């Protein structure tokens, strides 16, 4: 069954980078020290929370591509409208992080000796936000076409770079700025790989905003935006609060167990990403019912 096959590909995309991430993060924790490593995990959270600037377009474009899979003209409008809007909005998000970087750093309750390094790091981090969101958007095109093999080969390479490159930079210069520079380079590599996979569709789309298509994307994506705001807040805000109340060094000790628990969601996430395009283009109620039952039963089977 294609759902199971695609779910396995999604699991591979999660598991392989973890084999690099675990030792890489361990080395960075040792090299940077508790405070700077704690801030690094918060920096990762900032990029993740930047998903609010996605406006639900990643899920919307997966759905739309699945629905209009055989309509070349409409696909071009979908890709162009989503890319143009998201590039503008994510650039605004990056600018906001640049402008308020000093305020963010003050809130994190760090030692004065590390202020310059951390402040410069957050300014550099702001550049990763448009890159991160565009990458997510372009990969969503492949997900809409159910090309999960290509998606997860890209994810495996990209996430391995994202996990390992910061540690590599820290080997040569043990500062947070070096770690964020490594993160930025790895995000650029990830975006380039995504572009190569969908370059023909991006180039041929014409990069023009179509208002009718855009309204349809936003109407669906707007509901997901609510989840994009609430979910990261529930997952990441505890780190900001711990840093503010106890100091950034305590975040390093908290993040490890927290991330381990978060990994328990890998299996349902893998199945969910595989089944979403099928649900989007399912034409009959019986088909929807069958896919929904699979969605519910597959992630729970290993636990039973």
Q: Residues of each region from the PLM?
A:
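N-terminal membrane topogenesis motif
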Residues: 1-21, 73-76, 80-81, 118, ...
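Interhelical loop/hinge segments that connect adjacent transmembrane helices in multipass membrane
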Residues: 2-3, 149, 176-179, 192-235, ...
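Signature of the first transmembrane helix
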Residues: 2-59, 90, 94-98, 128, ...
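Interfacial transmembrane-helix starts/ends
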Residues: 4, 41, 73-88, 122, ...
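Helix-loop junctions and terminal segments of transmembrane helices
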Residues: 55-70, 143-144, 203, 261-293, ...
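Alpha-helical transmembrane segments of multi-pass membrane transport and lipid-handling proteins
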Residues: 80-109, 164-172, 192, 268, ...
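Alpha-helical transmembrane segments of multi-pass membrane proteins
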Residues: 99, 112-138, 189, 301
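Hydrophobic alpha-helical transmembrane segments
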Residues: 123, 152-200, 258-261
């Amino acid at each position: 069954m294609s759902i199971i096959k695609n779910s396995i590909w999604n699991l591979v995309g999660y598991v392989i980078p973890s084999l690099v991430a675990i030792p890489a993060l361990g080395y960075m924790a040792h090299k940077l020290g508790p405070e700077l490593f704690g801030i690094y995990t918060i920096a990762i959270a900032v990029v993740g929370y930047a998903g609010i600037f996605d406006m639900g377009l990643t899920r919307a474009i997966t759905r739309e591509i699945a629905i209009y899979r055989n309509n070349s003209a409409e696909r071009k409008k979908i890709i162009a409208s989503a890319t143009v809007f998201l590039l503008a909005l994510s650039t605004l998000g990056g600018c906001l992080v640049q402008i308020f970087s000093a305020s963010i750093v003050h809130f994190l309750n760090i030692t004065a000796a590390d202020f310059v390094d951390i402040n410069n790091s957050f300014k550099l981090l702001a550049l990763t936000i448009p890159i991160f969101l565009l990458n997510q958007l372009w990969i969503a095109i492949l997900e809409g076409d159910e090309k999960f093999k290509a998606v997860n080969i890209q994810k495996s390479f990209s996430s391995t770079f994202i996990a390992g490159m910061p540690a590599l930079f820290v080997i040569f210069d043990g500062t947070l700025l070096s770690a964020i520079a490594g993160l930025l380079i790895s995000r650029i590599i990830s975006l380039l790989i995504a572009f190569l996979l969908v370059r023909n569709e991006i180039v041929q789309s014409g990069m023009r905003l179509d208002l009718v298509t855009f309204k349809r994307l936003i109407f669906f994506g707007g509901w997901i935006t609510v989840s994009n705001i609430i979910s990261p807040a529930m997952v990441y805000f505890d780190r900001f609060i711990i840093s503010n109340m106890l100091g950034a060094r305590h975040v390093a000790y908290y993040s490890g167990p927290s991330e381990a628990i978060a990994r328990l969601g890998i299996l349902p996430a893998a199945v969910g990403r595989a089944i979403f395009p099928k649900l989007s283009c399912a034409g009959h109620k019986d088909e929807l019912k069958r896919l929904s039952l699979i969605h519910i039963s597959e992630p729970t089977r290993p636990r039973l």
